[in-house]
């Protein structure tokens, strides 16, 4: 009986691999991109690209686990949720008050060690803010 359950789970695992999430990959360079709107110091621009842009822009640099389900589904849901809260690729579309509020939220989240997410720091060592 244990073998049957194992084989069933193995087949199920293989089948779910056929259902890959949509990827957040855009090569478009938008005028509304934060770095196109403001001249940022290189250190800040580098910090944003290594710690924030994978979840908060229109272009995610995915690790290999995106191809393994259900990890890929989980990761894509986090990217979608992250872009809903803040999208640097569309930063210029925010109203001035909203943009200021988002920048304040970034500062607070980083000070309280809530961002980047722990799971992201685990596979992206460049994102550790120490």
Model-based region annotation:
Residues 48-59:
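The canonical Cys-X-X-Cys-His
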Residues 1-38:
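Post-cleavage N-terminal segment of exported redox proteins
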Residues 37-45, 61:
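Start-of-domain marker
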Residues 73-122:
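Extracytoplasmic electron-transfer domains, predominantly the class I c-type cytochrome c fold
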Residues 126-130:
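Short, exposed beta-strand-loop hairpins at the edges of beta-sheets
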């Amino acid at each position: 009986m244990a073998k049957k359950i194992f084989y069933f789970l193995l087949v199920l695992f293989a089948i779910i691999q056929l259902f890959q999430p949509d990827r957040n990959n855009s090569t478009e360079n938008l005028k509304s991109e934060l770095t196109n709107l403001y001249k940022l110091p290189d250190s800040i621009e580098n910090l944003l690209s290594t710690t924030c842009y994978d979840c908060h822009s229109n272009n995610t640099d995915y690790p290999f686990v995106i191809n393994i389900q259900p990890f890929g589904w989980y990761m894509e849901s986090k990217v979608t949720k992250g872009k809903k809260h803040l999208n640097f690729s569309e930063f210029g579309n925010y109203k001035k008050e909203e943009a200021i509020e988002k920048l304040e939220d970034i500062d607070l989240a980083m000070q309280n060690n809530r961002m980047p997410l722990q799971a992201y720091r685990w596979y992206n060592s460049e994102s550790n803010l120490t």
